């Protein structure tokens, strides 16, 4: 991913989708990757719908900790080889909203999808 592509990703996501950070630790995170069976989908591996912004700390946790990996799959931050990133919602935890991500760096917020599941009171457990 080059700087221009990462800038488009940052313009779409605006912050780490887990913690809301907006500092220089932000990196691109593949939702489906080689470790989750994404190698057979090389043509779509770097599509914008398969990329989200995470801070380096959250990225390390979901790549190395089983509990965090489960959480990442629950929120659509990580996907199995069978999931289509362009149709699988991803959760923006700081804004408490699910979104569909397009391959053109678009983002459609799903205002009624999962509504009420997370509130300010219980989101800290995630």
Question: What is each stretch, according to the model?
Answer:
Residues 24, 45-74:
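Short Cys/His-centered divalent metal-binding micro-motifs
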Residues 2-29, 53-58:
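Short cysteine-rich loop/turn motifs with clustered Cys
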């Amino acid at each position: 991913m080059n700087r221009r592509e990462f800038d488009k990703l940052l313009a779409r996501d605006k912050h780490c989708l887990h913690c809301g950070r907006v500092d220089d630790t932000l990196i691109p995170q593949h939702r489906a990757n080689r470790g989750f069976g994404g190698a057979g989908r090389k043509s779509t591996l770097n599509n914008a719908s398969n990329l989200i912004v995470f801070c380096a700390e959250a990225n390390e946790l979901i790549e190395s900790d089983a509990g965090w990996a489960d959480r990442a799959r629950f929120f659509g931050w990580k996907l199995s080889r069978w999931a289509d990133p362009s149709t699988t919602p991803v959760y923006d935890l700081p804004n408490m909203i699910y979104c569909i991500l397009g391959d053109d760096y678009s983002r459609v917020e799903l205002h009624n999808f999962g509504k009420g599941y997370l509130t300010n009171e219980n989101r800290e457990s995630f």
